[in-house]
């Protein structure tokens, strides 16, 4: 009888804990996912705008690549300061500020008439968005213990592929149907209309996000006590974690993570910004059809995120859930250069590459919080993202220059595939106690 009673109590506790985290997830993750969707859409819609604006404004492909890349200069410079401010003023205020300003600046791109204006606005857009992704990742560490974060980060980050699944067809439709409406080009309407959700979501942030679980009115006192106990136990398991700004900034493991993420983003941004061009080069001219086809690799990335993140949490293993997808993605991306005129093979290979490379991203982003806490976590998340986002400048600039020199945008993909393979050695070098929690 005592054994039966103990089993019943244990079952009740497990059920209560599951219900608690389910409640938190339904309250936070859908909203944050839509925010990330809006952010990434405003970041990469310039890839669709390129199909019209280069001819309208007489920009070269290299000028477009530089402008697309300058976003990341502003992003890199302001990433760490932005995340430290978020830690000081709270997620609610700072995420709202980020979203409203990036939405307004993205809309202003519709008024661009010169390369200088394009460069300035892309830089300012990067500065405005800086801190959003690492800020949300840091925010989630205040709600979920380490062993739950792989799946949760995957659920949050499905906003990334969803931005292309939803945004691709919508972007193509806007450019095709709004061209010359009220005397504006389709690409101008694109920047205006797709900025509106960011501003509206930024305003809603004031009501949707508590700064801390202790401020969540929808959690009971027992819920808060359970959550505090879970997070305290998680902190005890990572008792060697670092806490200060210095610990985050001068930690070799943070810089290693930045190098790994750099390799991820070289490929992710090449696919995100240039996928419409790859599909057009394979023989598709209609912008709406291009938008529909760009959704296929993004759907594959969404499935990859959910499956790889869930598997990693279930096995409490991170290293091989990163390495194996990297190898598969590198092979698929390099192979795509051999079929650049074949539409079916182009879409299939980029779908495989997207599912593997982007699918591993949530697992990767669960690593910093295994050895960083507090200010060090805020600094470490932002620093790793800052180092990595140099890839945005390198990727877009290299793609633009290579296209102007060779007439094709595919040659640079070999470089990006090689970087993914090299980053596998950095993953192997990370201590097992960090990658298997």
Swiss-Prot record:
It is found in: Membrane. Pfam families: MFS_1. Keywords: Aromatic hydrocarbons catabolism, Membrane, Transmembrane, Transmembrane helix, Transport. One of its GO terms (biological process) is catabolic process. It comes from the Bacteria. GO terms for cellular component: plasma membrane. Induction: Repressed by NicR in the absence of 6-hydroxynicotinate (6HNA) inducer. In presence of 6HNA, repression is alleviated. This is Putative metabolite transport protein NicT. It comes from Pseudomonas putida (strain ATCC 47054 / DSM 6125 / CFBP 8728 / NCIMB 11950 / KT2440). The lineage of its organism: Bacteria, Pseudomonadati, Pseudomonadota, Gammaproteobacteria, Pseudomonadales. The gene is nicT.
């Amino acid at each position: 009888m005592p054994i039966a009673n103990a089993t019943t109590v244990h079952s009740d506790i497990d059920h209560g804990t599951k219900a608690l985290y389910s409640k938190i997830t339904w309250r936070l993750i859908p909203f944050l996912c839509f925010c990330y969707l809006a952010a990434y859409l405003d970041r990469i819609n310039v890839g669709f705008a390129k199909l019209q604006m280069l001819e309208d404004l007489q920009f070269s492909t290299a000028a477009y690549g530089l402008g697309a890349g300058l976003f990341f200069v502003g992003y890199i410079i302001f990433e760490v300061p932005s995340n430290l401010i978020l830690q000081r003023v709270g997620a609610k205020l700072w995420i709202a500020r980020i979203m409203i300003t990036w939405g307004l600046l993205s809309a202003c791109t519709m008024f661009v008439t010169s390369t200088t204006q394009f460069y300035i606005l892309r830089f300012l857009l990067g500065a405005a968005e800086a801190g959003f992704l690492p800020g949300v990742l840091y925010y989630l560490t205040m709600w979920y213990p380490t062993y739950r974060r792989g799946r949760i980060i995957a659920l949050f980050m499905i906003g990334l592929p969803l931005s292309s699944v939803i945004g691709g067809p919508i972007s193509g439709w806007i450019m095709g149907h709004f061209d010359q409406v009220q005397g504006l080009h389709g690409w101008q309407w694109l920047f205006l209309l797709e900025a509106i959700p960011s501003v509206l979501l930024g305003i809603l942030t004031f009501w949707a996000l508590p700064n801390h679980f202790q401020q969540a009115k929808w959690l009971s006192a027992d819920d808060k006590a359970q959550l505090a106990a879970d997070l305290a136990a998680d902190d005890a398991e990572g008792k060697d974690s670092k806490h200060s700004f210095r610990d985050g900034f001068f930690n070799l493991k943070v810089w290693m993570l930045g190098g790994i993420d750099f390799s991820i983003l070289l490929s992710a941004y090449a696919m995100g910004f240039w996928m419409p061009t790859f599909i057009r080069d394979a023989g598709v001219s209609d912008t709406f059809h291009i938008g529909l086809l760009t959704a296929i690799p993004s759907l594959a990335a969404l499935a990859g995120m959910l499956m790889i993140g869930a598997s990693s949490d279930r096995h409490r293993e991170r290293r091989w859930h990163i390495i194996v997808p990297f190898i598969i993605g590198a092979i698929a991306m390099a192979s795509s250069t051999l079929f650049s005129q074949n539409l079916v093979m182009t879409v299939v290979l980029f779908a495989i590459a997207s599912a593997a490379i982007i699918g591993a991203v949530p697992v990767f982003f669960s690593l910093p919080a295994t050895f960083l806490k507090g200010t060090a976590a805020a600094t470490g998340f932002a620093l790793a993202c800052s180092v990595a986002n140099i890839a945005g400048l390198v990727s877009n600039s290299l793609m633009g220059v290579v296209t102007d020199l060779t007439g094709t945008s595919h040659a640079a993909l070999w470089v990006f595939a090689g970087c993914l393979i090299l980053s596998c050695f950095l993953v192997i070098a990370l201590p097992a106690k960090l990658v298997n929690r």
